[in-house]
């Protein structure tokens, strides 16, 4: 602790020598907007990360990149997984897309499944809320995370981009190359990282105390936490992928095609499914061995998740008259996805496989009618998920006992048809946005014959939902620099295949999940008020929101240890977000500074707290440029989270400090050298949104070096 305090004091004294760039949002075009408007002219709340913002987080999961944004958090499951959480919810309420189309992975089906978006190829990421989000489908009720792949951008400049990097925390290496020549582009990216190093014991003190209390006087269950830097077993990860793209046609009509292939292999800490209290192998998070002098032990097995994905994306854009419309765009995405999970249980190996084929089609017509910019779209999605019965074998992976059990999910097929209209109008200092969307969603599971009479699966045939979503936003420009407005959205969401059909043990996460085919559609009435102000070299955004849910779907633990049911209850989430950015002139130098604060509260109708609601967080950044150097400092302070759900432990707050400096040698045009330190003070960081928060903290101090050459 003394070292942390000394470093923090030093940073406070020298703060003005470092920086964090303020985002010039008024100069950034919102690509997710159908009409490509500036962020200041879009009523829907939008957060934007540019290529410069993304560059420092290429190696991390998507959630880690977004975590610094107001109202956005990450639900991590080890260093390879970070699912985005928007205003307290994620999963099937937040649609993660690439260029407005489905990615085709299975990250939403479980917290341990990673997202496959390639950040190396991504030139901009947008978090979109409000009316414009309805453009993107029935599972975008809370928001959309939309990444834009530079391969699909027909205007990407010609040239080559080469990246090499190293991170000392996990002996991580990354390499990447992107080249665009004429109308064709090609890229490849690889990452290899060993186990992460954490600043202290894997178990949180609160979890350890509860486990010790439950264990009682059983001496075999006693073990001490080791407070010191140690390696976290079962946190390795590898990633390799390549992409090729081409553009054909002219400025009026253009066909763009892109093919990508990726392979990801990562380990996650695993708790044995029959674990109840400390059994001598409870340190499945891989730290703090009981009888070894090493910093870690590997007595407990991990879950090895390997996935492969191939995606084909085609886009036809016509910038000319099509009947009464001014332009037309059609997108097609076809994805083949495979994932294998291998888990070391005490009595052998458990292996589960997932295969998913998905097809996504969207056609959009844009035009102007009575001074209203209007977009009319049609959408079709078909997802065929095959989840074969998992195998139980010996330690060598052989299925020597011939035992097969039903998998976590049955084979399922889901189909969605959508029709949507989005319109906006600007006049007399008023901005208006309106959207309406109709969806027909059908989901069907192929249950085993012997289960047809099971009470859990007494529904025959497909489950269908008819959804109507409406959103309206209105804003007033009080002057050229002040915008006040709000939006109201009525949304409906169909339960997912997991929430409906799950019926078994998900070995990778060590719990049994039971779906309910009788679940109703989830509905929400969302309201938001905001103010945006710009003056001189400063700008401020404040948003207040409330989401009132009917039949909110969530997991609830049963009386049987390790078994969870998907249930429904009314719920409410509300909070606020603040973002302030300014330019300062200090010591004859221009500084960019930013402040942010966000808070969200989630409650069930009976007054109980919703689980995994992120804690309040405060962010601060300051930075400057001089000669060929850019330097920056980012500080994030997260409060304690004591408003916990049933059986959920409180999470201590933390303060994380990141610093970085980049240098562009004048003699080597196109070369950028970057040095950064993440978690400078080696803070114990536990995200309340993470299912592993009480088993594994975030990585400790990480010194990173990268070199990037563009020519």
Describe these PLM feature segments:
Residues 146, 155-156, 163, 180-306:
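Periplasmic-side early beta-strands and strand-to-turn transitions of outer-membrane beta-barrels
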Residues 168, 294-315, 354, 412-414, ...:
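Outer-membrane beta-barrel signature, preferentially recognizing the C-terminal barrel domain
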Residues 233, 251-327, 335-358, 389-412, ...:
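Flexible loop and strand-edge segments within Gram-negative outer membrane beta-barrel domains
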Residues 63-105:
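Extracytoplasmic beta-strand/coil segments of soluble accessory domains associated
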Residues 272, 336-338, 395-398, 442-458, ...:
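Surface-exposed extracellular loop regions of Gram-negative outer-membrane beta-barrel proteins
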């Amino acid at each position: 602790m003394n070292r942390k305090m000394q470093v923090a004091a030093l940073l406070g004294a020298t703060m003005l020598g470092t920086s964090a760039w303020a985002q010039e949002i008024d100069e950034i075009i919102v690509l997710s907007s159908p009409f490509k408007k500036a962020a200041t002219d879009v009523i829907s709340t939008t957060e934007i990360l540019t290529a410069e913002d993304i560059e420092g987080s290429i190696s991390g999961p998507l959630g880690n990149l977004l975590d610094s944004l107001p109202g956005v958090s990450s639900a991590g499951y080890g260093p390879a997984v970070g699912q985005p959480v928007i205003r307290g919810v994620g999963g099937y309420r937040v649609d993660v897309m690439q260029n407005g189309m489905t990615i085709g992975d299975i990250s939403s089906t479980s917290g341990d499944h990673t997202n496959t978006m390639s950040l190396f190829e991504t030139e901009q990421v947008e978090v979109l809320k409000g009316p414009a989000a309805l453009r993107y489908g029935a599972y975008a009720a809370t928001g959309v995370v939309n990444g834009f792949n530079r391969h699909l951008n027909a205007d990407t400049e010609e040239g080559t981009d080469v990246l090499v990097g190293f991170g000392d925390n996990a002996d991580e290496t990354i390499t990447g190359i992107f080249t665009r020549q004429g109308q064709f582009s090609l890229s490849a990216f690889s990452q290899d990282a060993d186990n992460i190093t954490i600043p202290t014991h894997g178990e949180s003190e609160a979890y350890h105390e509860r486990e010790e209390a439950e264990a009682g006087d059983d001496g075999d269950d006693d073990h001490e936490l080791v407070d010191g830097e140690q390696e976290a077993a079962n946190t390795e990860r590898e990633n390799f992928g390549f992409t090729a793209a081409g553009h054909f046609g002219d400025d009026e009509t253009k066909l763009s095609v892109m093919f990508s292939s990726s392979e990801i292999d990562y380990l996650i800490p695993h708790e044995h499914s029959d674990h109840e209290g400390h059994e001598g192998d409870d340190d499945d998070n891989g730290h703090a061995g009981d009888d070894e002098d090493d910093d870690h032990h590997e007595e407990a097995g991990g879950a090895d998740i390997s996935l492969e994905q191939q995606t084909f994306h085609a886009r036809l854009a016509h910038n000319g008259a099509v009947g009464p419309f001014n332009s037309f765009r059609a997108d097609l995405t076809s994805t083949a996805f495979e994932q294998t999970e291998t888990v070391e249980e005490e009595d052998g190996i458990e292996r589960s496989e997932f295969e998913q084929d998905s097809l996504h089609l969207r056609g959009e017509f844009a035009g102007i009618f009575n001074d209203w910019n209007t977009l009319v779209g049609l959408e079709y999605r078909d997802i065929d998920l095959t989840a074969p019965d998992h195998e139980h074998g010996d330690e060598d992976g052989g299925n020597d006992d011939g035992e097969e059990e039903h998998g976590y999910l049955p084979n399922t097929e889901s189909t969605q048809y959508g029709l949507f209209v989005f319109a906006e109008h600007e006049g007399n200092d008023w901005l208006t946005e309106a959207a309406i969307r109709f969806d027909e969603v059908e989901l069907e599971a192929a249950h085993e014959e012997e289960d047809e009479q099971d009470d859990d699966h007494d529904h025959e045939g497909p489950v269908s939902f008819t959804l109507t979503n409406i959103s309206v936003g209105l804003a007033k420009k009080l002057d050229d620099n002040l915008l006040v407005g709000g939006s109201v959205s009525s949304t409906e969401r169909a339960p997912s295949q997991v929430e409906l059909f799950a019926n078994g043990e998900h070995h990778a996460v060590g719990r049994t999940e039971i779906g309910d085919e009788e679940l109703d559609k989830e509905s929400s009435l969302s309201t938001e008020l905001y103010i945006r102000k710009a003056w001189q070299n400063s700008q401020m955004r404040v948003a207040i929101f409330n989401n009132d849910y009917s039949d909110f779907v969530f997991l609830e633990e049963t009386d049987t240890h390790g078994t969870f049911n998907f249930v429904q209850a009314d719920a409410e989430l509300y909070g606020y977000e603040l973002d302030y950015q300014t330019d300062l002139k200090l010591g004859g130098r221009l500084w960019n500074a930013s402040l942010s604060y966000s808070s969200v509260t989630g409650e069930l109708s009976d007054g109980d707290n919703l689980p995994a609601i992120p804690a309040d967080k405060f962010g601060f950044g300051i930075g400057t440029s001089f000669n060929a150097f850019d330097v920056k400092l980012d500080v994030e302070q997260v409060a304690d989270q004591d408003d916990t759900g049933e059986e959920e432990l409180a999470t201590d707050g933390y303060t994380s400090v990141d610093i970085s400096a980049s240098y562009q040698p004048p003699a080597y045009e196109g070369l950028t050298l970057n040095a950064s330190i993440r978690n400078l003070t080696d803070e114990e960081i536990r995200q309340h949104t993470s299912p592993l928060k009480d088993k594994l903290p975030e990585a400790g101090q990480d010194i990173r070096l990268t070199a990037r050459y563009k020519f």
